[in-house]
Amino acid sequence: MSFRGINTTVIQIRRQVFTEVARMAYANVKGEQANHLMRKIPYTIIPGEEGKLRKDIFLERAIVEERVRLAMGLPTRRMDEHNSVVSGLEDASIADKYYDPPLVNVIKFACNRCPEKLVKVSDLCQGCLAHPCMEVCPKKAITWESGRSTIDQDKCIKCGRCVTVCPYNAIVKTERPCAAACGMGAIHSDELGRAEIDYSKCVSCGQCLVNCPFGAIADKGQIYQLIQGFNRGDRIYALVAPAFINQFPSLASTGKLKAALKAIGFCDVVEVAIGADLCTVDEAHDFLEEVPEKLDFMATSCCPAWSMMAKTAFPGLAKNISMTMTPMVFTARMMKQADPDARMCFIGPCAAKKLEASRRTVRSDVDFVLTFEELAGIIEAKDLDLASLEVDPAEQDLIHASAAGRGFAQSGGVAKAVADKIKEWHPDMDVKIASAQGLAECKKLLMLAKAGKYNGYLLEGMGCPGGCIGGAGTIADPARTAVQLNKYVKEAPFTDPEQSAFMSNIHVLKDDPDFEL
């Protein structure tokens, strides 16, 4: 389970790191002054002379140092080599700098070396006469010793049947939280028992980093580079994903959100749900053209973790992933065409969007990617009094996207929007859809599709539980966000994506003069 909505110590430290990195960037200093500020951050976050978290203040500060480096887009340091915390800072100070892979990293000396998977009998065992645990074990791994059940770990296959039948809940099944959260099976143990990521499988969804109770996993960020752009006077647009709802309770209205984003340095704010409207229409066209004549089924393309998983784990199905641009790319490209000298910053719930933005085909459209958590750190660093922010009456709301576009933020929303559009064009057509959330479930969906169970279907996959609102970069509890999102969808100024004032741009953005609505 993740800890969104619970203000744990791990989350507090993560957000403090974002805030202090942003403060350092706003200070706009170079050289030794910048080095000094960076070296100071661990002492600001972990003050005093005694460790309170791991009983070793030097270890606590060393871990914070690595988190600071990653938040600035710098790589973690090797443990067997001497390397200053400020190593590479000069390169990171360039506003055009983008981080090098890998995006998601394990801070090795922060890892607790949790067991990969274990079933064990606790002290709650009552030594009952029925001992159903022994009876159901398919490998006869449970025996009776000293008046209680004992599990032979060499025989145990971790099936969990004993856990289910124990009347005292005395048998527990534990698993490394980061590995349990990884739907790709990309996390295993290194030779020292620490978590290690197999990057040939990892799709950077970020679920491991929000599920690690020790805060040993973190992703790279562009907070520092973005603020360098502000300092330089660049015109930078904030492209805000619809999952922003409920993430910032102090910003009770979209007008307040826009005011806050402009106060920290953005020139204007655009809702990415506009791009979702364009995506809906384009994907509906794709489905009608491709299925079933050319493809057995078509899968949506909006979630980069889902599409990357499909192409990595099921290379033969890569052709079934829609070629439609994601809402982020549609929106960024549209704004770049309207303001060619400006730069674009996507602000959303997703770690995988950072990976998407680094692709060669997207890099020229999207300059920066921030998560909502990182944005919260920047707002904190700016010391904004959110309650007294003045809202321009002419710009009180984000009112340029449809209800369907706003609904992309929730699992099932993309497929529903596309299917509804197809049914509008072809009322007699039965559009069958299926969706999955979380990469493990997404893999099951594609396995069934590969076996021919979903021929003629439109499939939607969301890498995070709940969809975008459950992304690794969110702040609020996804269940509560879902309630607020549904309200936000109902408040949209129109329902049909084709009513968008920006729909006429679609053929230009696709570079397809023959595209017709």
Please describe what each predicted stretch is.
Residues 1-82, 219-517:
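Iron-sulfur-associated redox domains of electron-transfer enzymes in respiratory
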Residues 59-62, 66, 84-89, 97-102:
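Extended, highly charged accessory segments
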Residues 93-122, 139-140:
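N-terminal [4Fe-4S]-dependent radical SAM core
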Residues 130-153, 161-198, 203, 207-222:
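Iron-sulfur cluster-binding cysteine motifs and their immediate structural context
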Residues 121, 152, 198, 240-241, ...:
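A secondary-structure boundary/capping signal
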Residues 118-130, 155, 201:
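N-terminal pre-triad scaffold of radical SAM enzymes
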Residues 112-120, 143-148, 189, 207, ...:
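Gly-rich Lys/Arg/Thr-decorated short loops/hinges at beta-loop-alpha junctions or inter-strand turns
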